Amino acid sequence: MSRAKRIALALLLVAVGAYGQNARIPADAVDAFHAALKNKDTAAALSLLDRGLVVFEFGVVDPTVEAYALAHLPLDIDIAATTQWKLESRRVGGDGSDRWVISSYRVTGTQSDGTPIDQTMLETAIVRRSGDRFRIVHLHWSTNDPTYQTSLKRSGAPKAR
C-alpha cells in the first residue's frame, strides 16, 4: 500500500469517532452500518466498526479494519448503492458488552455490471459496547446463490488469506 493511502486511511480512522452514530442498542449499529453503505458514506460506515474488526465475506477474510476499508468496503458500498436489502428476520442475543445480531435479508437490484441480484443474504454481526454505543467487531456475510459467488470470483475480489 502506498504511503499516501496509509496516511489517508489513518486520518479517516482517527476521524471516525466523531460520527459514532446513535448505536445505543446492538441492532442500531448494524442498521446504521447498512444505511452508511447505502448512502456511500465511508466515514459513517467506519465509525461503526471497532478497531478489532474481522470480516468474513463469501470465503474471504479481512483480518483488520484497515484491510476491510481498503479491500472490500468500497465494493460493499458499490453493491449497497444499487440494491435494496429487505430485512426478513432478525435475532439479537448476548449479554454484557458483547452481543450478536443475526439477520437475513432479501437483496434485490443489480450489480455494477448490470447483472440482476435477487437472493437471500445471511449476516452475522458481533457488536461490542464502547462507552454508550455499540460498534461492530465481526461481520460474516454469506449466500447460497452460486451465480453471485461466481460473479465475485470474476470481479477480482481478493482471495482468502
Where are these regions (language model features)?
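Bacterial N-terminal signal peptides that target proteins for export
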Residues: 1-8
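Short, low-complexity N-terminal intrinsically disordered segments enriched in polar/charged residues
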Residues: 12-52, 154-161
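A solvent-exposed, acidic/Ser-Thr-rich amphipathic alpha-helical stretch
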Residues: 42-95, 118
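Solvent-exposed loop/turn segments at secondary-structure junctions
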Residues: 52-53, 60-62, 107-109, 142-146
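Short, cysteine-centered beta-strand-loop-beta hairpins and adjacent loop/turn segments enriched
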Residues: 79-80, 107-118, 145
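A short, structured loop/turn motif at beta-sheet edges
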Residues: 92-99, 114-115, 127-135
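A short hydrophobic beta-strand element
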Residues: 97-107
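Short beta-strand edge/turn micro-motifs at domain boundaries
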Residues: 120-150
